[in-house]
């Protein structure tokens, strides 16, 4: 099993010369995409909705939209917490798993972050046929 590497994706923004890191891998979470999405929905309500809204629409002065056309822009918004570009779902995952939730950054398991992101991707119209993992996240190009 490959070693889970989250932080190097974030460092790419600081140094274009570094090689791409290995993708995060789940450690035994949901075995079906339906179960992963259901788990992600509940985790989203519990951990994310206060700042990102009950439908992912964003909350002014708390958190940006995570569902809809304004979700996950390639470049950071002015005054955003993030300072990295989002080209793939793996980029979003790497940043989110280090910086979210805002009141307890990095406090969830890899499987929990993947579940939330699987829920969020499907809410944005991305079709997932199997549970989201690192290789699948790297293959989802948000901004070519």
Q: Model-predicted segments: where are they?
A:
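An amphipathic alpha-helix signature
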Residues: 86-97, 110, 114-118
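Electrostatic cytochrome c docking/interface patches
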Residues: 18-43, 59, 104
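Flexible coil segments in periplasmic/lumen-exposed cytochrome c-class electron-transfer proteins
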Residues: 103-144
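Sequence/structural segment immediately N-terminal to covalent heme-attachment motifs in c-type
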Residues: 34-59, 63, 67-69
